[in-house]
Structure formats: structure tokens, C-alpha cells
């Protein structure tokens, strides 16, 4: 299956990438504030509502600060994280995301992607 990988930013001021394959769009980390996140997606012709899932690698703000903005615009978004990362991030959120928990080091699947 073919895929496209777009790096929106990678630095101490924010990390964010998009993986697209077979009509599925997964954001890898959401390390930008809402307006920057939206502008970065718009450059790809996308909006927050077009995302199917986000995978948060860890709880540092340069990897997850935009999660609340994503969830405001896409409440059904699936959020992948390991249990400890989810626990730490949940404390800062006003809503409860659709957490998809995985064990670090294991393989998991989402819409045919592993």
C-alpha cells in the first residue's frame, strides 16, 4: 500500500507530521498551538476534521500542545498513546478523547495500517 509522509515541523518549538495511506490520515504528534496547526494543515489542503487519528509519542508540549484544538474541531478523533502518556495528557484536557491505548514496543493496527 502506498503512503505519503508530510513533516509539518520538527524542532523544540513543535513536532508534527501527517501520514496518509489508502484514504486514512494520521497525525504523528500535535506539537503546534491551534492556529499554527490549522495553518500547517491548510498548506496541505487539509483541515482538522479530515484527520482520522493522532498518535502522541509522549507528553512534552512540543508533541501534544495542539491536541485540545484538534479535539474541539474533530471530537471523534481517535488518539493513540501509551497508557502513561494518555494519563499525563488527560489531566490537562477538558474533554476525554477516544483514547486508543497501546503498549510501547508492541505492534498495533488502525484501518489496515500497522
Segments the model singles out, each with a brief description of its role:
Residues 1-44:
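Conserved beta-strand hairpin/beta-sheet module of binuclear metal-dependent hydrolase folds
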Amino acid at each position: 500500500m502506498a503512503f505519503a509522509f508530510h513533516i509539518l515541523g520538527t524542532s523544540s518549538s513543535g513536532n508534527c507530521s501527517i501520514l496518509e495511506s489508502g484514504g486514512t490520515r494520521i497525525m504523528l504528534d500535535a506539537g503546534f498551538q491551534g492556529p499554527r496547526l490549522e495553518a500547517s494543515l491548510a498548506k496541505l489542503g487539509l483541515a482538522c476534521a479530515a484527520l482520522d487519528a493522532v498518535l502522541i509519542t509522549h507528553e512534552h508540549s512540543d508533541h501534544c500542545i495542539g491536541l485540545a484544538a484538534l479535539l474541539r474541531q474533530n471530537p471523534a478523533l481517535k488518539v493513540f498513546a501509551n497508557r502513561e502518556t494518555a494519563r499525563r495528557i488527560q489531566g490537562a484536557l477538558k474533554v476525554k478523547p477516544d483514547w486508543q491505548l497501546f503498549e510501547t514496543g508492541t505492534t498495533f493496527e488502525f484501518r489496515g495500517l500497522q
